[in-house]
């Protein structure tokens, strides 16, 4: 009888741990999707201010609604970023002209570029010294881009030098504007 009670308690504690992880994940997702909605809203506002006599309906392309959430793949740090892929995201060590700056000595000044093409996120290695490795799935060894490009997929890991970046790709939906 006592063993049965301990098993139930252990199972309940495990369920609480799973719920906490799911809750934290949902909170993280809500934050980066909320940030993307704000960026999208700002793009619409900027367009409206530049074109005061035109309707802002359907002015942004499919590429403008495509976003990427980037975070360090192996640590729970503060460094998390949300970018509109339609704006082109340059990643490198250099402080000029890069949207994401990595302080890794094995990363080139301008290492790679994330961009949108026909509503799909792509990555292009800018002939970096050490190349760009894309890992897909848990057991994938990855493949090297060296001066070439490929389509990015959700949950890809980009390896630049010693830096590993996990990617989430998503589109801004109209219902994101209703969240507050």
Region spans (language model):
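Short hydrophobic/aromatic patches on the structural cores and recognition surfaces of FHA
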Residues: 91, 111-115, 119-124, 128-133, ...
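Residue-level marker of beta-strand positions
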Residues: 65-67, 88-90, 133, 151, ...
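Intrinsically disordered, low-complexity acidic Ser/Thr-rich regulatory segments
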Residues: 2-103, 172-180
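C-terminal boundary/linker segments immediately following FHA domains
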Residues: 135-180
